[in-house]
Each structure stands twice: as C-alpha cells, then as structure tokens.
Amino acid sequence: MTDSAIGNVYDPRALPDYDREFIHPDDLRRFENALNDQDVLPLVALNDWRPVYQRVRKTRGRRKEPRRTKDETREGVLYTVLKWPFLAFVLGWISFLGVAYILTRFYIFIYEQWVSWRGKRQSLRKQLYVQTNYRDWLKAAEALDAHLGNHAWKEIDENAYYDHITINKLVSQLRKLRQDAEWEMHHEQVNAAESPAVEELCTILEACVKNNFAGVENPRLYSETYSGTKVLVQEYVDEVKACLELVAESKQISDEDKYHHFKHLDTNFGRTALCLSGGATFAYYHFGVVRALLDNNVLPEIITGTSGGALVAALVATRTDEELKQLLVPALAHRIRACHEGFTTWVRRWWRTGARFDTLEWARQCSWFCRGSTTFREAYERTGRILNVSCVPSDPHSPTILANYLTSPNCVIWSAVLASAAVPGILNPVVLMTKKRDGTLAPYSFGHKWKDGSLRTDIPIKALNLHFNVNFTIVSQVNPHINLFFFSSRGAVGRPVTHRKGRGWRGGFLGSAIEQYIKLDMNKWLRVLRHLELLPRPMGQDWSEIWLQKFSGTVTIWPKTVPSDFYYILSDPTPERLARMIHMGQQSAFPKIQFIKNRLKIEYAIIKGLQQTAPRGGGRATSPTQLRLRNGHGNGPVNPIDERLDQNLPERTGEYSKEADANSAEMSDSSGVDSATASALREARHPRRNSMLVEMQRQSAVFFDDVDSDTWKGQ
C-alpha cells in the first residue's frame, strides 16, 4: 500500500458526508419531549365509593415495592427460609467452577503452544495473521494445509458428517442431465415421446436443493482444513449452481413454471443473515468483519444488530457498497464521539439520572450513522438491505421486538439503535420514534420505553426465521463475557485442531472433556437459579439471560481481543486502535469466507432465477424498485442497487404498495395504533386466502420475537 493510500484511510475528510449533520433539530426536540412525557397514570381510588385521585395522606416511611410478587414465587415458608442460603451456596459453587475453568483453559493454551505449534508449522501459522486481504490469506492457508497434509483429506470422499454416497451419485446425475439439457437447447431437438431433460433436472433439483441436504453444509466439513472442504462437496455446490443457471435460461419451460420452481427451491433452501452482537466498544470489531465480507462479495442482504452491533448494522444498511468501502477505514474513528465527556461530567449525570451518558447527545451522534431520521423502510428502499434491530421492553415480562421494514416500517432507525444500546446504568430506556406522513416524528408504540436487546435476544434467530425464512446465520460475536467461554473442542470452520492432522481434540481428550464438563455444570446451575426464581433483579432486569441465551449461529466469527479492550470498553477509539480492530475483524472472518461463498452460490442463483421469472403486476407483490418506476421515479437504467433490491423476495412482504404503507403510517402515528393493529385492519379490508390457523399465527407473531414457549419450536 502506498503512502498516499495509507494517509487517505486516516484522513477524515475522505469519508463520505463527514461534515454533514443529517438530523433536523426539530426531530431532536420531539424526541426530548417524548422522553420527558410522564407515564400515563391509571385511575385509582381508595375503594369503590371514594372519588378517584383523592388526596391521600403520605406515610412516614417509604414502602419499597417487592422485587418479586407471590404470583412469581408462590406462597410458602420454605422458599423464604431457604432462598438466600441456597442462593449463596450455588453462587459459591459457580465461582469455584469459574476458577477451575480458567485453569483448564490455561492448561489447554500451554498444551497447544508448547506441544502443537512448533517448528515450520508455527512459522506458516504466523503468516496467516499478517495478511491484509483474503487472496494473500488464502495462499498462506493453502501452504499450511500442504505442510500438514490436509490436501489428502480433501481428496477422500468418505466422511462421517455427510452422506458421500448420495452426493457422489447426485453429482453424476446432475452433470449428465445438464449436459443433455444444454445439447437440447443448442440443437432445439426434443423427443416428443420423452419429457425434456430440463424437466427431469428440475425434479432432481427440487429434491436436493434444501438446507444442509445430505449434510453438505455441516460445519465439520470445513473444520479440518484451513482452506476449502472436500473436493466432492465443492463439486456438488458448483454443479447445483450451474444447473440452476441453466434452468433459468432455458426456453423449454414457461416463465410461470420456472417462477414456481424457484419459489419452491427458495422456501426449502432458506436465506442467509449476518448477525452482529452487542458488546459496548467491542462492537467496533464488526467493522472489520463487514469489510472482509464486503470485499469478497459475500455480505448478506439481511443484517441484524443488537446494542453496539445495531450501530454497525445501521451504518451498513443505510449505505451503498461504494460508500461502505470508503467508510470502513480507520478515519471513521473521527466520527465516533459518543464517549468524549470527562469523568466528572458523567459521574454527576449518573448520580442525578442513574445513567452515565446523555440520551439526546447519543441521539445526535447516532443519527450520522443512520443518515438522520431514516426509517427502516427508507433504508430498505435505498440500499436493498434488510435491517433488523432487537429491542427489549422495560417491563421484564413483555416480549421483545425485532424492528425491521415489515414489523415497523416507519420507525426511525436511530431511535431503535439507541433503545437497543440502553443498558441499565449506562443509558436510560428510550422511546421509539416513528415518522409520520408529513415527515415529523412522534412516539411509537404508545410511547413505551425500550432498552438493550442483548439482555434477552442478542441473536434473534427465531424471529429471523419467522419473518425472512432465515436458516443460515453468520454471527459475529464480540460480547466479552461470552468470548471467554467460547471453546470448540474439535476445531471451528477454517480453524482445525492443531495436532493429529486436525482429527484430534484441543488440549487432548482429557483437557476437552474437563472443559466441557465444567462449562455445562455452570450452565446447569444458572438455569436452576432462574427456574426457581432465586436470582435478584437489580435495576428491574433478569440478568441470567445474558448467560443462558444462544449466542452462536451456523457460522460464528470470534474476533480476537486484547486485554486493553476492557480498559477502553466505554471509550471512543483512536484511528490507530480502530485500524487494529478492523484488521483483527478481517482476520477472524477470512477462515469462514469459503463456507459462506459456497452457501451463497446456490442462494444467489435461486434469487436470480426468481428475479428473472417473477411475473410483473397481476396482483402480486410489488418490489420497491417497481414501485418507484411505476410512480415516475428513476426512469434510467436499473443500477446494481435496484437489481439487489428486487432480489429480496418481494413475495414475502405481502402486498407491498405505497397506499397500504401510507395507511399504516397514518393509523400508527395519528391514531396511536401500533403497526400490528394497523396490519390487522389492513387484512380486514384485503382478506388473504390462507387458512384460519395460518392467518391467526401470522397476525400474532408478526411483531414479537423469541417467545420462550414450546409452541414456537415447531416453526
């Protein structure tokens, strides 16, 4: 990299819209008014025959409301007597297990450093960590695989983690049918007594294009080498992609039949989503992860973020690819100014308000990353990316919300990002804001307040599957309290075990067994405390969920942190520190790219087939691009953003029309009706041809996420 290029990535003036303040002062003023509005008081009276709001004489002592009521703890003497002794015993045992776990991990670290990584393999391994782009990293990974003899493993079809016999036969069948179909297309000759080869090809594709068919998407198949997977698995992926492209281009099948074919494949195969976890300033590692995926054209269109990850997700979802390539550089640190206040300032604020940071100042700083008061629907129409932000209500018993352009299209993104980052003691709960038809802001969802989504749903996998059929998740996990306990005893994707040619156990079988036992025992006792309602609720929050929820996905990226990150956990990064975090984020994503590429090869081929064959008009859903063209906007040629916009499967969005969305906004904003109620009213005017059970399930589930109930397990 030249000196001018290096200087450019550190120059804040090279950032797009660096000096531009997107948010209007009136938006901040309305947000401040919404925060200061008093909660609506219910009608109260001493009894049925006294007047309401009668003046009541104050008692001398202030009565504290109980943390838990009898509805939760039930009545009983033993609960009161045994609660605190049992809680002390369990917490003491968990502390002992924690110390034992740290010692076990230290033993495994020493074992790997002094037994496994020695000699030439150590020097080749060091080359992986100094590469700045995926091409050079892949060369270094292939050299390490060649030294360890991993290429021989790729050539052998047999493996316990997938059905190699079925895949081998299937590849041969697909290749033969594709060649026959190509011959028929070029010579335009089809035997009248037989069906075209392309129809037989479609039949086989409908049987095999499914999520993790025959185990070909098992992460274990990518966890025994540093680069790539089995040759047979790679041949299968490439052959399926070629067959899908052939079907889309074939003239022997009508567009309507091809559309239904690709729609069926899409339903079975599902979608891919990028999930960015919370973690305070650890979330800046996400910039490097996103940069690595963007540079290699494997950045999914569905993105979800929580807490600090929501800020990164908002930046990604509101910018185009070209803008992101200019923004994801160390100079971005000059725009991260949320923690610039001194010690005395935030101590006084915390003593006065119970929160370290000022909500209005954070709203002003956050608005630049969200391009002002952009809504979820406006971001989707601008970039084609689907942004999701997880928020938790202040009431510990209410369900969480996954805000996106379907559940809350007119919700302002920066308000959702603030709510998702409102950790108790750091930032007070926040009111979500919605944009009305005239462009002004108003409180959303009856003015209820929301807080940090990481407290209950850091990775909202269930809601993503419900709304967008997501069944393949790429999780970038940076929560510091979770990274300590992440341990893959049999290796991870692109990170095989260091000895026995990747077929052994980390730290030996004994070390891995002890680690697993201690970790599972700690998890068991935490669940016991939660189910027996023994844990206190500081600040009105059940803190057990920050340990017991699921934090991983199909592919989990764990950026490597350093001890100084804990010291700067609530501090703005310098350009030099952000440069290191971006580099480490890229390094952690490089081993996963080949796995993600193979997944997206098939997914993008299906989406492209849907785009090419989708009927125009006819009462079907309208994509945002078609909507703009129909209304006289954007009469020029379709650009790549519009092309990607049409690929986001509009058939899942229901009747996507401007009139329907305007009615939804009017009802939600002016009448105080939330989007779920507005959707129900809309459905009453336009009934769908679904069964009663499906319709009731869709209406009840469209707004809420991750309900802890057995009824959701079958979805």
From Swiss-Prot:
GO terms for molecular function: triacylglycerol lipase activity. Residues 613-715 are annotated as: Disordered. One of its GO terms (biological process) is cellular detoxification. Keywords: Hydrolase, Lipid degradation, Lipid metabolism, Membrane, Transmembrane, Transmembrane helix. The keyword Transcription does not apply. It is an enzyme of class 3 (hydrolase). It is a single-pass membrane protein. A motif (GXSXG) lies at residues 305-309. Its EC number is 3.1.1.-. The active site is at S307, D452. Its main location: membrane. InterPro entries: Acyl_Trfase/lysoPLipase (IPR016035), NTE (IPR050301), PNPLA_dom (IPR002641), Triacylglycerol_lipase_N (IPR021771). The chain crosses the membrane at residues 84-104. Residues 652-661 have a biased composition (Basic and acidic residues). PROSITE patterns: PNPLA (PS51635). Residues 274-465 form the PNPLA domain. GO terms for cellular component: lipid droplet; membrane. It is found in: Membrane. Residues 665-678 have a biased composition (Polar residues). It comes from the Eukaryota. Pfam families: DUF3336, Patatin. Probable lipid hydrolase. Belongs to the PLPL family. This is Patatin-like phospholipase domain-containing protein ATEG_02594.
